[in-house]
Amino acid sequence: MNRKVTVVGAGNVGATLAQRIADRELADVVLIDIIEGMPQGKGLDIMEATPVEGSDSRVIGTNDYKDTAGSEIVIITAGIARKPGMSRDDLLNTNYQIVKTCTENAAKHSPNAILMVVSNPLDAMCQVAFKVSGFPKRRVFGMAGVLDSARMRTFIAMELGVSVENTHAFVLGGHGDTMVPLPRYSTVSGVPITELLPADRIEAIVKRTAGGGAEIVSLLKTGSAYYAPSASTAEMVAAVLKDKHKVLPCCCYLEGEFGIKDLYVGVPAQLGAVGIEKIWEIKLTDQERATLHKSADAVRELVSIMKL
């Protein structure tokens, strides 16, 4: 492999993501962390699995950003994880400094890279990466909607007893309690779930989707989700590296779309080799639009605290 992807942060999300990228032979992977030995050990462990997986991707772990030079994609997963009782917003001040430093280093060594942000609070951290890197908006975006939509798809499949492959869902807005699941655009084999389920069951699915991350945090007690987040990020990585022109819900910088300006919020976007190719401004009802704006207001409040 010649293509290089850097994963910043060798914690649960970062290491699992590195493994998924290598297993799918999408690129060579550089796993970087400030803790000496951890990225090297995990990188070697993942590399030693590649013969079994039939992958020729190379994986290295490092503490030196020089090893990340020339990456096509840099994925920032670094930051502290949530604990029970914490919201994603509680991570703001600590993760702001972490994401700022990671972005500065990534931009210095890979000035032409696409920056993909996974660290929470997601939408605010995207704003940090965008401002600090100076990259164009198409090359800085975040992973949230793919994960939230995957959770909603899971709950739809469980409710109806169908294959998850038959389900599609769209979740917009901020990656937090104010996210906006859209039942009208959520389907089973093309049929909207509003025609398949009563309102109370749909409401239960929407509520569980919004609390999906917190549910896992409360069960784990010592950390947060990483299997589904890493799988969701890998799907976005594949869409970029394979130039798929794939429409996925991503955290994008809006300049008037959906009536939202100068802010990162989750919306449908087309992903390809250049990053965000296009934002799909789907039609929303007045209520859906108002809910999306409420979600955006919550993100804007967080961003204002950071005084970027």
For each feature predicted by the language model, list its residue ranges.
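NAD(P)+-binding Rossmann beta1-loop-alpha1 motif at the extreme N-terminus of oxidoreductases
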Residues: M1-K42
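Short glycine-enriched loops at secondary-structure junctions
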Residues: G11, S119-D123, Q270
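Conserved N-terminal Rossmann-fold NAD(P) cofactor-binding segment
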Residues: I32-E72, R300-L308
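Rossmann-like NAD(P)-binding element
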Residues: P51-I114
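Rossmann-like NAD(P)(H) cofactor-binding subdomain of soluble oxidoreductases
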Residues: S87-R153
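C-terminal substrate-binding/catalytic lobe of Rossmann-fold NAD(P)-dependent dehydrogenases
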Residues: S133-R139, D148-L308
